[in-house]
Amino acid sequence: MPMPTHLHAMPARALAMGLALFCSLAQAVTVEFQRVADGVYAFVGETGARTAENEGLNANIGLVVTPAGAVLIDSGATFQGARQIAEAARKVTPQPIRWVINTGGQDHRWLGNGYFQAQGTESIAHAAGEADMKNRGNDHLVGLKAVLGAKADGTVPTLPSRWLKSPDERLELGGVAFEFKHRGGAHTPGDTLVWLPQKNLLFTGDVVYVDRMLGVIPV
């Protein structure tokens, strides 16, 4: 069996080959999905910290296109960032975004939920992260506003509309299977792997880090 493709922290240079780092950081973020498998795409975020230029989108965002609609893996850090993600998805597919899967409790995984829920999109996460999201959502927003300023305007911490409770769950949309695997949390309590068996592809969220180290912050 071939090894699965891992999507978490692919190099930012994949989106900005040939640009000097200081130049790319000075420009506003452009959300653009690149194909990684048949019907599967990813926006590869910067591996550095949140900045006003990257609008807090220093994470990878997945897009899975099915015959019954599209699925986003994570919703971005802000309302405005979520709108950019949606616009980028429309350049890939005319399919409506049916689901947003929040892989964890970091701001850039779920604070864009409000935008998508206003469009009628269902947001899905593991119930192990519910308390963490409730307790830290406003703190995340305060931190984002300090960095992003007006780019955080319109953002309201909006909890997922559907909670998964078992360690292993399987959902299907348009004949495409999504297997959710919660193994006790990682960076946050709700961190969940999303396995696409038909694609042999794994979205790892904040469970696996590549090309960077976890932040070590005194508390």
Regions found by a protein language model. Give the residues of each.
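Short, solvent-exposed loop/turn elements at domain surfaces
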Residues: F43-V44, A49-N54, V71-I73, G81-A82, ...
